[in-house]
């Protein structure tokens, strides 16, 4: 028997009416939500043509699946199959493969290095192009490039030509005459006046036979020339024999009245495979003129008696050939002798072509100026022979540049 058995307990549904209404409302809401979920699921199953979404397994997909598996069925269904509001139901979101990840290394350093190398390569190409353009302008202005003891073109051919000329002048081995000349020599009559002279005295002798002496003092003769030069130009005893058969005697000209050549012709080389024939007398005259010119010019010992810091270069370019690059190129070329303080180009109007343009170089040391004069005097520049000497330092500083040297 309980404590309150004697009390009457009224049982009525009015006190529980509010709770039952709320419960019924909850049940109705759950049913509506369940119906919406089932309807959406049925629509997705009908769209069989849509591809399944791609899942990136490397990005912790297992933890997401495990989380979804632990959730209730209706919540898991909502998480697995969300329908975005901004996309249609048929679109599928695929994550990008190259999505930026700050923890993952990239190619930034390689790209920067490649761009730096490309810029450096472009600068090198531009510098090389500028050098080539400068060399091209220099070659267009001068026939020979830079300072040189002799012109650059055909230097190898000139050396070969000089070597062959020295061999001929040394009187080397004689070339055997053709058999036709030997047979004619044997068939000559006994009374032929030059038969004995045409035959060599000995087989081992390579020098030419001296001409016969005649006892005719009144006979006019041309002045005798140097014997060694003729024999060297004639190429030895064979050519001498052939000329003697036609009546040639040393010091006399060919022909009946001796008006022909008294010395052999020679060839002067003009190009790689070309040349011109010059008379031996003209060659000897030209050599004599060259020797006289060399003797007239001031020797280097006279130039070096009064050295200064200023060097004067003449005959580098002719009148009207001065351009804007000449000063820079000359200064750069002379930097190898020592530091050049100043380079001045002065042109004298009305002067001869080899004296019109003067180039002054002021070195910081006298030793550098002496090196420049010794090395540059007599060199070729653009087909011209450079004249180098010293100039008064005081007159150079007051710009008195037209003094006679």
Curated annotation (Swiss-Prot):
Family matches, as CDD domains: RRM_UHM_SPF45
BP GO annotations: alternative mRNA splicing, via spliceosome; mRNA cis splicing, via spliceosome; RNA splicing, via transesterification reactions
Domain of life: Eukaryota
Main location: nucleus
Pfam family, one: RRM_1
Record-annotated G-patch domain positions: 235-283
SMART domains given in the database record: G_patch, RRM_1
GO cellular component: nucleoplasm; nucleus; protein-containing complex; spliceosomal complex
SUPFAM superfamilies with a match to the protein in the record: RNA-binding domain, RBD (SSF54928)
Gene3D superfamilies referenced in this protein's UniProt entry, alphabetically: 3.30.70.330
Disulfide bonds listed in the record: none
In-chain residues carrying the UniProt-annotated modification N6-acetyllysine: 21, 41
Biased composition (Basic and acidic residues): 57-68, 114-153, 182-200
Positions bearing Phosphothreonine: 71, 237
Residue segments, region Disordered: 57-88, 114-233
Keyword Nucleus: yes
Record-linked InterPro entries: G_patch_dom (IPR000467), Nucleotide-bd_a/b_plait_sf (IPR012677), RBD_domain_sf (IPR035979), RBM17 (IPR040052), RRM_dom (IPR000504), RRM_dom_euk (IPR003954), SPF45_RRM (IPR034653)
Domain RRM: 310-389
Molecular function GO terms recorded: RNA binding
Alphabetical keyword list: Acetylation, Isopeptide bond, mRNA processing, mRNA splicing, Nucleus, Phosphoprotein, RNA-binding, Spliceosome, Ubl conjugation
Entry-annotated residues carrying Phosphoserine: 2, 155, 169, 222, 266, 295, 297
Assembly: Binds SXL. Associates with the spliceosome. Interacts with SF3B1, SF1 and U2AF2.
Biological function: Splice factor that binds to the single-stranded 3'AG at the exon/intron border and promotes its utilization in the second catalytic step. Involved in the regulation of alternative splicing and the utilization of cryptic splice sites.
Protein name listed in UniProt: Splicing factor 45
Protein's organism: Mus musculus (Mouse)
Lineage per the UniProt record: Eukaryota, Metazoa, Chordata, Craniata, Vertebrata
